[in-house]
Amino acid sequence: MQIRYAGHSCFIIEGSKKLLFDPMPLEDPAAVEADLTLISHAHADHIGDAFARFSLTIAVHELSGYLKSLGVKTIGMNIGGSVEWEGITVRMVPATHSSSIRQKDGTSLYMGQACGFVVEMDGHVIYYAGDTGLFSDMKLIRELYHPDIAILPAGGRYTMGPEECMMAAAWIGAKTVIPMHVNTYPEIEQDMPAFKRAIELTTVMHVEIMQPDDVLELP
């Protein structure tokens, strides 16, 4: 199995199936095909190209209904639910963040609660946090699902920053931590090498700092 980073918070995880997480706007949406798309919330930097895709899409109930009205094939879920699909288990877990679509008149259309995902595929358990602040129930994600990979936001301002991300990583206890939603824009610039050193000097966890188009190969 491999994890490819497409930038910002967009990842492609490919094993027995190809999963796409939070498809930010890309120059060529068709260049990143997937069997299943997972969207954590409705902000433009995460829902991105979902409208231009034809893969099955998982999203929270309200957002799923909105996408379905635009012709996207969807599976609606809510926090605490799970879906079995083609030998893959997808669980929807909490995130502390807003979720809305900005309309042409400048108002925002509510799209349900933001979420994260815990995905079991090919012997791995991956926690994709989506945009979120730190919350203590992350400890339950470790207790219930035991992820071996955690993909966590670390940019601050709109999500938790490096210090909170370090605490989240300790609570979740995954062997590998991949920071996201960081260093994309000036307002979310952080020192990721320092973040990596701080975690790896004090824990047994490994931090994988990925650049766009980097690929992490998993056994």
Swiss-Prot record:
Gene3D superfamilies: Ribonuclease Z/Hydroxyacylglutathione hydrolase-like (3.60.15.10). Keywords: Hydrolase. GO terms for molecular function: hydrolase activity. The keyword Mitochondrion does not apply. Pfam families: Lactamase_B_3. InterPro entries: Metallo-B-lactamas, RibonucZ/Hydroxyglut_hydro, UPF0173, UPF0173_UPF0282_UlaG_hydrolase. Transmembrane segments: none annotated. SUPFAM superfamilies: Metallo-hydrolase/oxidoreductase. SMART domains: Lactamase_B (SM00849). Signal peptide: none annotated. It comes from the Archaea. Belongs to the UPF0173 family. This is UPF0173 metal-dependent hydrolase Mlab_1154. It comes from Methanocorpusculum labreanum (strain ATCC 43576 / DSM 4855 / Z).
